Amino acid sequence: MISKVLVANRGEIALRVIRACRELGVRSVAVYSTADRDSLHHELADESVCIGPPPAASSYLNVPAIISAAELTGADAVHPGYGFLAENARFAEICERVGLTFVGPSSRTIAKMGDKAEARETAAAAGVPVTPGSDGPCESADEVKRVGAEVGYPLVIKASAGGGGKGMRVVEAEAEVEDAYLNASREAGVTFGDGSVYVEKYLRRLRHVEMQVLADSHGTTVTFPERDCSVQRRYQKLIEESPAPDLPEDVREGLMDASERLVGSLSYEGAGTVEFVYADGEFHFIEMNTRLQVEHPVTEMISGVDIVAEQLKIASGGRLEIPPEALSPDGHAIEFRINAEDPGRNFLPQAGLVEVYNPPGGPGVRVDSHLYAGYRVPPHYDSLLAKLIVHSRDREGAVRRGLRALDEFAISGMETTLPLHLAVLEDEEFLRGGVTTSFLAQRNLESEGGLLRLNVIGS
């Protein structure tokens, strides 16, 4: 078993990893920027090292500082969490070269799946359905036009090196290709340092469904029940749930089989998530995230498996010993991302002093957060403040529990997305289940009696 893990992250995920280490008897090292000197992960870890000033480029993305911290403290492994360096193949390679165990797949696998065009080719070669589109990157607007002539419009141009909506443009007709190609390529180059793009057929009414996998070095792969992540804003997930509501059993089985085929073709090790779109009764591969997901607690709640602990065991060379019953969903779980954003003012980012922090409790309620009363939320990083996860015997019960827990959750000192989640849980379409990724885009947020309400545009 690895003996000391440096956690190359901050916030709630750093706390999550440190707690898993404690339960396994593994010592932990926190790294922190000067903006996070009062952070809980800095306090809870066995050791901590300041790695730089507030900007992420000078701290949490500062590879030499992180490697030096590992050497200084005698850490023998690095857990990257999510975001920052979690899917940076170069960082994983450096860890490998200096003898640090990277808690995740190999640098080669990260690089292969990090190039979205190559990942698409890899999936197709493994027999996984992919959306009709280009074979690899498109080198010119003319290539995009050729794909359009073959598969039809609309198309979506995507950055090969990234995600999150950056370097992405929807093209409705051939006349739009030139500008869309140039703009997508330019944005991809600025954001990811790589301007290459590829093209897929654009599907309008789709759901975002993903499969959580674990794989060890002994050839064992475990695939958990699917998560539905369709409630999004500008390609950023806000609510995730498992199992996916109103999903045919044959589709569920197909998603599991496709995920296992892809993971098997990669000789994968660690935790990963295979992401798909589901539309018109068919599913297609989007990408594979070679890291722990923000929404991993949803799977933990319905399976009883500690995914972070399993990551650490796999990295230590251990075998997966997950009972078969953990792979069938035990009830229903929903996760709500509580962000420091004002939904009433176009999700304006928030920062400042947390005056009151009172998380909910009770049966089937979990809160993963780094907040406390008196904590000052810095403006330099991701807006995630907390994750509220609720679990019940069925979806209806999980929704009721979510309404109660959200109403009980008190954070003051800044605006948050708590009111938005309450509004979603009162929306009739969401309650029916199976909403598409355009769910929020089709609605206006309006204040009514001091509460937010979602109203369908044009209704």
Feature roles, as predicted:
Residues M1-A125, C138-R146, G397:
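ATP-binding N-terminal substructure of ATP-dependent carboxylate-amine bond-forming enzymes
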Residues R146-V156:
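Acidic/histidine-enriched active-site and ligand-binding environments that engage anionic O-linkages
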Residues I2, V7-V26, T34, S48, ...:
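ATP-dependent carboxylate activation and anion-phosphoryl transfer catalytic cores
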Residues G133-S134:
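Conserved beta3 strand of the protein kinase N-lobe
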Residues A57-S58, I110, G167, H296-V298:
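A generic structural signal for short coil/turn motifs at secondary-structure boundaries
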